[in-house]
């Protein structure tokens, strides 16, 4: 690399093309006329170009003349005429300071002020270019495809490593010259050490004369600090570009150029010296390369021949070893086949042994042996100890014989045997649980059950089991789990329990005696009647007390059985889950059958069946129940409600509405039937009434007192009717005792023939007492039956009172609305009407109180009762006027 000495033409030199610096050497420079030829440097400086310039000239002066001036680095004007030239014309060099000398341009000489001001030399320098200036060039068509950017990017990536190597070796600024010189000197012989030491000392002095920042990796000339270091206190007068400073500027340029050329000469000289020292080694290495290549070819041919020989030998050895291995494998396969036959024979022998155990009823040993045979068929000896002891001396692993068709019959036989054993265990479990269920139900009497339910006590007897019973259940569940029949055993018990609960109803159904059976059998055989009609007839022939007793026995027995079944459910579920959790290697079906171990679904099915069947039994006596006395009907209602509620408590859900619907239908029909029955009773009593004072029993007066007190509170004797344990019996016993006491004291107290209602006393009649009994029954039914029927019973009370008034007056009234002269004491009738008028007010206030506690009940309007009181008052006045004495004269 060289820098031109002449800084005159500043515009020539560094040109900017595509953003990179470009150094152009003019044609007229001495370097182009030198022997080394001309060269152009673009971009970064090249080491090879520097060597070329050094080799073309020996003297430093000649090399200095070939270098460009720093004037080329300075910025130039856009239209400087010194940079313009035409094709094939001679470019003016940096040192060409002469002109043509013609006086046509300036009479004052070259470069005169006149020439500069008038611009006589280059008047037409800004003319348009011609064909001579710019020759015609045929532009090529751009045939780039659409993906040219992708191709360029890929190409740049491919040459990136090569470019980095080139840049690191071709840029002198990125090289550490001292390290390269040191590496070159390490290869010299020992006899040149003294000469090299002296030369190294001289080279070091030359290198030390160059400032260190030129060898820095971060050398950047565009950095102001670096640029000032390069100038080294040389003033180029760049801020004053006038002609007055031109001479000083030229001297500064020359000084800077000379200094830089000296630095370059030092580096080039050292590089050429070091390279020339190693040139003979390079040629020696080239001569040895040919020899190495020849030897490498010979070695490759020998290696190929050796590889072929080794391949032949290996193939022969491999064939022998393969043949040997095939014989070994064949022998092992034969041994495995023999062991498999022994395994199959052992399976058959153990199966026969298992069959004999089953015939001897050794079920546990048989089940254990079946399990071991199953492992033997699977070829698994890792778990079962029996299989390990049977095959301890066998050399090979057991085979899986499950896919062998010859053993399919044996496997099926073992499976069936396991199922039969599980069936026996299941039957034992069901029998044990059913016996416990029966003994539990027998140990509890119906009264105890009713007392427990009505008092709300929970003795938890259903969950108490003896240790012996629990241990037996545990043993059976363990056996069932071993034979994988646990779920089927629970299903069997579920079916057995349903059958057992069905039989409870059959136990308490009515039956005929032997004599009656013969007569009725002959009659029914002739008529072709079915057993169902016979049972219906027997149910209808029962007395109310017998029917009630049958329902109580069925319901209490069934409830205790259901309680015990829920205890069985908890016990079985706890033991089963513990057994499943204790198994070390659970079966694949054990996790899926946990939900199948709960017998709750069977218990719920039992509840549905019992309610359905008892509902049908009750429906058979639907017509007969309409004529029941009110206390028997309430007992019937109470036991049905108790059973329905207890079933709901036990199951936790309302399973069926059948029994509830049957009971609701019975209540509705019973309430509707009360109207005609009451009319008949009242009509019968009035028709037979003689209107004479009637003896009032103490029980009747007690009922009247209860009716009066019902305005404020429910009488105790009315609410205890629903007590199934014995409250109503105590009440009846008390009444009979009072009656006997009154009869015993009759001779001393006389006959009581009046009814006391509050603070009023009325002479009693037979029809009055019968009507009071009707009113009492309706009020008792109103308190104890659901509130939805209150409106019906209020209407019945209202109609009964109204009907008594109309019937009584009709019995003593002529067609002309005048009273008959029958000779009977009509004042007794008036007393009865006045007494019932008091009951009208009591009935009104009674149902008004019930409406306050029952939002779904709306009582009669007060106007209805006012009208009824008016009717009673009119009848009483009419009777009074008929019996009044004539007025005095």
Curated annotation (Swiss-Prot):
Region (Disordered) residue spans: 1-44, 729-748
Record GO terms (molecular function): syntaxin binding
UniProt feature, compositional bias: Basic and acidic residues: 729-744
UniProt-annotated location(s): Golgi apparatus, trans-Golgi network membrane; Endosome membrane; Mitochondrion membrane
Primary subcellular site in the record, as a coarse category: Golgi
GO biological process: ascospore wall assembly; Golgi to vacuole transport; intracellular sphingolipid homeostasis; protein targeting to vacuole; retrograde transport, endosome to Golgi
Composition bias, Polar residues: 1-14, 30-44
Coiled-coil region(s): 286-321
Keyword Nucleus: no
Alphabetized UniProt keyword annotations: Coiled coil, Endosome, Golgi apparatus, Membrane, Mitochondrion, Phosphoprotein, Protein transport, Transport
Modified residues (Phosphothreonine): 74
GO CC annotations on file: cytosol; endosome membrane; GARP complex; Golgi apparatus; mitochondrial membrane; mitochondrion
Protein origin, superkingdom: Eukaryota
Modified residues (Phosphoserine): 69, 72
Membrane topology: Peripheral membrane protein
Stated family: Belongs to the VPS54 family.
Note: Present with 2540 molecules/cell in log phase SD medium.
PANTHER family (UniProt xref): VACUOLAR PROTEIN SORTING 54, VACUOLAR PROTEIN SORTING-ASSOCIATED PROTEIN 54
Subunit organization: Component of the Golgi-associated retrograde protein (GARP) complex, also called VFT (VPS fifty-three) complex, composed of VPS51, VPS52, VPS53 and VPS54. Also interacts with YPT6, TLG1, RBL2, SEC10, SEC15, EXO84 and ARL1.
Task of the protein: Involved in retrograde transport from early and late endosomes to late Golgi by linking the vesicle through the t-SNARE TGL1 to the Golgi, leading to the membrane fusion between late Golgi and endosomal vesicles. Also seems to be involved in protein transport from Golgi to the plasma membrane and is required for the integrity of the actin cytoskeleton.
Protein name per its UniProtKB record: Vacuolar protein sorting-associated protein 54
Organism (species): Saccharomyces cerevisiae (strain ATCC 204508 / S288c) (Baker's yeast)
Lineage of the organism: Eukaryota, Fungi, Dikarya, Ascomycota, Saccharomycotina
């Amino acid at each position: 690399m060289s820098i031109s000495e002449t800084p005159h033409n500043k515009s020539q030199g560094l040109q900017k093309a595509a953003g990179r610096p470009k150094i152009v050497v003019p044609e007229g420079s001495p370097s182009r006329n030198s022997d080394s030829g001309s060269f152009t440097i673009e971009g970064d400086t090249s080491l090879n170009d520097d060597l070329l310039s050094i080799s073309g000239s020996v003297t430093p002066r000649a090399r200095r003349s070939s270098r460009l001036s720093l004037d080329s680095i300075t910025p130039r004007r856009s239209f400087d005429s010194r940079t313009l030239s035409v094709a094939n014309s001679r470019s003016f060099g940096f040192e060409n300071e002469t002109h043509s000398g013609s006086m046509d341009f300036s009479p004052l000489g070259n470069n005169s002020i006149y020439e500069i001001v008038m611009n006589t030399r280059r008047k037409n320098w800004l003319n348009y270019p011609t064909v001579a200036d710019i020759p015609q060039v045929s532009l090529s068509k751009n045939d780039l495809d659409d993906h040219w950017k992708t191709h360029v990017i890929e190409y740049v990536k491919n040459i990136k490593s090569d470019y980095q190597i080139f840049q690191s070796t071709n840029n002198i600024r990125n090289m550490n010259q001292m390290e390269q010189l040191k590496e070159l000197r390490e290869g010299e012989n020992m006899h040149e050490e003294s000469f090299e030491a002296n030369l190294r000392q001289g080279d070091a002095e030359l290198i030390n004369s160059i400032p260190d920042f030129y060898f820095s990796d971060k050398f950047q000339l565009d950095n102001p600090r670096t640029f000032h270091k390069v100038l080294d206190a040389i003033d180029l007068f760049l801020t004053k570009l006038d002609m007055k400073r031109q001479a000083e500027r030229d001297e500064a340029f020359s000084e800077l150029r000379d200094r830089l050329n000296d630095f370059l000469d030092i580096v080039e000289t050292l590089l050429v010296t070091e390279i020339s020292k190693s040139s003979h080694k390079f040629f020696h290495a080239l001569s040895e390369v040919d020899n190495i290549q020849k030897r490498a070819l010979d070695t490759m041919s020998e290696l190929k021949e050796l590889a072929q020989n080794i391949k032949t030998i290996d193939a022969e050895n491999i064939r022998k070893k393969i043949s040997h291995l095939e014989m070994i494998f064949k022998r092992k396969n034969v041994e495995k086949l023999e062991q498999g036959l022994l395994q199959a024979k052992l399976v058959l022998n153990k199966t026969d042994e298992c069959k004999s155990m089953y015939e001897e009823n050794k079920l546990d040993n048989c089940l254990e042996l079946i399990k071991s045979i199953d492992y033997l068929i699977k070829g698994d000896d890792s778990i079962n100890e029996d299989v390990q002891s049977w095959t301890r001396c066998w050399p090979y692993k057991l085979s899986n014989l499950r896919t062998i068709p010859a053993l399919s019959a044996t496997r099926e036989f073992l499976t069936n045997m396991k199922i039969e054993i599980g069936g026996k265990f299941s039957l034992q479990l069901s029998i044990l649980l059913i016996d416990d269920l029966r003994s539990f139900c027998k140990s509890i009497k119906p009264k105890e059950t009713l007392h427990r339910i009505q008092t709300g006590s929970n003795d938890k007897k259903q969950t108490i089991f003896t240790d012996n019973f629990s241990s037996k259940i545990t043993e059976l569940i363990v056996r069932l789990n071993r034979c994988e029949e646990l779920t089927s055993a629970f299903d069997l018990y579920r079916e057995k329990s349903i059958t057992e609960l069905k039989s409870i109803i059959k136990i308490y159904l009515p039956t005929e005696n032997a004599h009656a059976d013969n007569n009725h059998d002959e009659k029914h055989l002739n008529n072709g009647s079915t057993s169902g009609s016979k049972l219906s007839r027997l149910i209808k022939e029962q007395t109310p007390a017998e029917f009630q007793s049958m329902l109580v026995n069925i319901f209490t027995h069934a409830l205790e059985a259901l309680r015990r079944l829920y205890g069985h459910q908890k016990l079985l579920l706890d033991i089963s889950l513990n057994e499943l959790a204790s198994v070390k290697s659970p079966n694949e079906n054990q996790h899926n059958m946990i939900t199948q171990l709960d017998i709750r679904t069977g218990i719920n099915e039992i509840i549905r069946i019992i309610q359905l069947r008892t509902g049908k039994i009750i429906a058979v006596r639907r017509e007969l129940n309409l004529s029941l006395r009110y206390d028997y009907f309430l007992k019937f209602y109470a036991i049905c409600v108790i059973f329905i509620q207890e079933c709901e408590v036990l199951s936790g859900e309302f399973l069926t509405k059948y029994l509830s619907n049957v009971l609701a239908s019975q209540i509705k029909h019973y309430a509707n039937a009360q109207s005609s029955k009451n009319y008949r009773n009242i009509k019968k009593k009035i028709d037979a009434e003689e209107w004479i004072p009637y003896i009032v029993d103490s029980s009747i007066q007690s009922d009247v007192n209860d009716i009066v007190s019902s305005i404020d509170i429910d009488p105790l004797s009315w609410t205890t009717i629903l007590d199934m344990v014995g409250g109503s019996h105590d009440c009846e016993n008390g009444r009979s005792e009072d009656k006997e006491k009154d009869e015993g004291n009759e001779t001393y107290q006389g006959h009581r023939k009046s009814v006391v209602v509050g603070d009023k006393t009325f002479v009693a009649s037979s029809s009055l007492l019968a009507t009071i009994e009707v009113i009492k029954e309706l009020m008792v039914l109103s308190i104890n039956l659901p509130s939805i029927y209150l409106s019906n019973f209020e209407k019945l009370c209202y109609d009964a009172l109204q009907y008594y008034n109309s019937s009584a007056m009709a019995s003593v009234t002529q067609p002309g609305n005048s009273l008959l002269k029958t000779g009977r004491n009509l004042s007794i009738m008036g007393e009865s009407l006045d007494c019932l008028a008091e009951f009208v007010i009591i009935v009104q206030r009674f149902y008004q109180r019930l409406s306050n506690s029952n939002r779904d009940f709306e009582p009669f309007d007060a106007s209805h009762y006012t009208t009824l009181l008016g009717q009673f008052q009119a009848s009483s006045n009419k009777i009074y006027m008929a019996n009044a004495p004539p007025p005095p004269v």
